[in-house]
């Protein structure tokens, strides 16, 4: 490449590591991501450094952990937390260097429309509070669908349950991201270099795929669920409440729709790649594909994210850059989302003001200062906080609430079914296979390594006298996604009722029966009428 490359960052939300056919998961249909694998470099040991939406996305744009940017978890509108204004973001650094910086889709910034150096920002939020702040919501109104409030699927009552999109395929959020991305590629091709962030909400729940894609995985063999043989953490036990599946058939169908959602995103990614080719910019573009975190999807009976297990914390990562990668390369070193900022700046030839503080390093380099033999992940604060570290064979997690610990053998037990520290006390066969002194030695080695990572990159106050602190045990609470539509009534007097949206969303999903759902729980807030729902 003789000129500064364009940069295309494609992100999905909540996509597990094991969802791309060409990376070894042949139950998936992902022809366009498979193409990127063939033409670039895939990273099968990629992790989210904090597996929850807002935290991970702030790591991406700053290249730094929550210790610096402040977002250790998801925060909401009533929390005044913001990135420090003197903290560089890579879109701002690219903009300062002459790039046109564009973002389309879900950002999950706070404040909502903070640009972070992005000069053209077109938002599609999961739960837009005001239509005028959300370009996608305005787009739907312009195209005759302004009466629908649950534009990304019905979250209230049906959050993790099987459902369909109430929109035609061409107006679905995933289609809109590709449509607007294609527009900006056409507008910018041949001019100054551009950075484009195409950010899909899918496959984040609700799994509201269009009708044409809904049966792609119906009846097909899917990977078995992971099952734990030892007790789970309090955080994982709390997590089990997020989904309410009356029967196994509901979960099976939800998994089918999750995978279909990914295939639909893949289809739209193909459109974006094709436009780059048509404009002659494909080989002059650094393309990065990844996700902010994974999805438990029923493994160990848990759902969503924010857990240290690979289903939640491990993500797909593919980089296409012909100047460095010949195609079909596989880099099995540990990488994470903190590496995106230095990778982007490396390709663009842009310096970071204070590189010594960055935990990440460009993946375009085959070697460097970063120790890629270990991977550190963190999440949250207080008694809900945990931190994890793994090497080539073992993963160790420390839960600050009560000082609980987990240790998994990732070679012999890649599904993380048996916590060696718990199993030693109960299983004679494990005591023979893993003598207590061996388990203890591994635990001590990784515990010491985690202390060093927490001292350097973790939130302040969690290491005292070179030891991880012990806090009061976490108090689990019963949690269900309780998100009725939020558009103020004055925005539109002709909204479809929530009850009608529920009926439309499940009309073609035979497995879902209203009589089997926990409707009373969702009527307590007064936003859903059981009588109207069942009329």
Per-range role (PLM):
Residues 3, 26-29, 48-52, 78-87, ...:
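A short beta-strand-to-alpha-helix junction
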Residues 128-132, 293-299, 338-341, 346-415, ...:
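C-terminal cap/loop subdomain of S1 sulfatases and analogous C-terminal strand-loop tails that border
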